[in-house]
Amino acid sequence: MEPGTARIAVDLLGGDDAPAVVVDGALRAMRADPDLHLLLVGPAEVADGLIGALDPVQRIRVTVRPVRAAVGMADHPVAARADSTVRAAVTAVRDGIADAVVSAGATGATVTAAALGLGRWPHVRRPALVATLPAVAGPVVLLDVGGSLEPGPATLVRHAVLGTAYAAVAHGVAEPRVGLLSVGTEAGKGDRLRRTADPLLAAVPLPHGARYVGLVEGYDIASGSRADVVVTDGFTGNVLLKAIEGAYAMAGGPPASGGVPRAAALLGVAGTVVVCHGAARGDDVASGIALAAHLWRRRATETVSALLDRAPQTPSQPGDHADRTTDTEVSL
């Protein structure tokens, strides 16, 4: 465990089984990390129940921001504009009361709340959700897994830079290999998005000595032998992530190189934001809180943002003037 205090704002009402599993996860996280401080955002009676389960020394590391409104899993992301728990948690980060936010609520609402409340990085049209997957040869960083469902080619290129910097800063990967997920490895394979993005990725300089290895397939993610960072659209990435989770459950567990991805970091906003699966259990929420603390202690968000600022900008492509907005996103 890395040293240093980390103040994490936790959305108590985010997730299918909130607040019970969120309270369980917060308790686990508190007991595992003596330098962790939590800001519990939600109904006071729920927070009081959690605090009552802690010993006196742990209780002084918990504060409460009473909020009763929640964004439902079926609600439109625009609901995040209201006075909801996820928006209040993001506001705490913006105001310097917390260092990072963790939510298992609706992905679209969390992304929207973060983008509106914290602001986006320059040159990032759509933030990306980044998950780290266990593979035979070592961890593989996969993005996007749900932040931008229908991006344009230039967005995929920016996400490649984001993923490369994240792999180096958050996971210590030296000279990451970057691949674009497609249906074959030969040049020209894939849909129009892949065919357009492939040569752009081949031409763009990547940070930390990274190199683009070309198109990769699904089994390359499982092996980890061809790429350390795999870029795709958020729709495909989210489906793939959940398929992998299901496969691990059926097989009895992931490879020995790492555990099932339980949370994703949101890159492209001016703050540390971690999104857990809506069906998260207590240990998943605890892992999300631990990830948020890890990223904050490494100042990962700030470092990745600085690397992105120094990276060359990708020229706009025909039809790439605006990524399509889907029902899990709003125009920002």
Positions of PLM-derived features:
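Short, glycine-rich nucleotide/cofactor-binding loops
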Residues: 8-20, 147-157, 275-282
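N-terminal phosphate-binding or glycine-rich loops at protein starts, especially the Walker A/P-loop
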Residues: 1-47
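Flexible, glycine/charged-enriched surface loops at secondary-structure junctions
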Residues: 35-37, 171-178, 206-218, 258, ...
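Glycine-rich phosphate-binding loop
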Residues: 92-111, 185-189, 194-261
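Glycine-rich phosphate/nucleotide-binding loop
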Residues: 115-142, 223-323
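Glycine-rich phosphate/diphosphate-binding loop of Rossmann-like nucleotide-binding domains
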Residues: 33, 37-39, 44-45, 149-215, ...
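Phosphate/nucleotide-donor binding subsite
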Residues: 56-98
